[in-house]
Amino acid sequence: MKTSRLPIAIQQAVMRRLREKLAQANLKLGCNYPEPKLSYTQRGTSAGTAWLESYEIRLNPVLLLENSEAFIEEVVPHELAHLLVWKHFGRVAPHGKEWKWMMESVLGVPARRTHQFELQSVRRNTFPYRCKCQEHQLTVRRHNRVVRGEAVYRCVHCGEQLVAK
């Protein structure tokens, strides 16, 4: 999806949130970190990614359109926090104590590692697998690893190895 397909109001709301949280961080940290590059090129089930070396945030336009309010409130600060942590502390654990501190103490946003958005529209082909207690859907990548004998996956609930249906 090209940026031009995203309504301008949503793009403006994203920029407003990014600038608001960046200004808040700069004030609290006593720094003058620059505005990162922003693109809408993230694909798949990831809501966004922070590219440290290029100081860029890539957002998933499909998930943004489907979950605008929650996405703007949570994902934009989440990715910004990664860039700010990298600038402030250098290379550290992606969701470590520095990131949690940046999210909660500096940006004032709950530190959640994953989103809870519905993924049906962005999920690629999946393969059904079973265990004792339920059916699972494995991604193409995980399925291929099983087929090649490179990986074994287990159910987090019952611990049984997953087998193809």
Swiss-Prot record:
Cofactor binding note of this UniProt entry: Binds 1 zinc ion.
Domain named SprT-like: residues: 22-163
InterPro entries: SprT-like_domain (IPR006640), SprT_Zn_ribbon (IPR035240), Uncharacterised_SprT (IPR023483)
GO cellular component terms given for this protein: cytoplasm
Cofactor annotation: Zn(2+)
SMART domains attached to this UniProt entry: SprT
Amino acids binding Zn(2+): H78, H82
Keyword match Zinc: yes
GO process annotations (BP): response to stress
Family: Belongs to the SprT family.
Protein name as annotated: Protein SprT
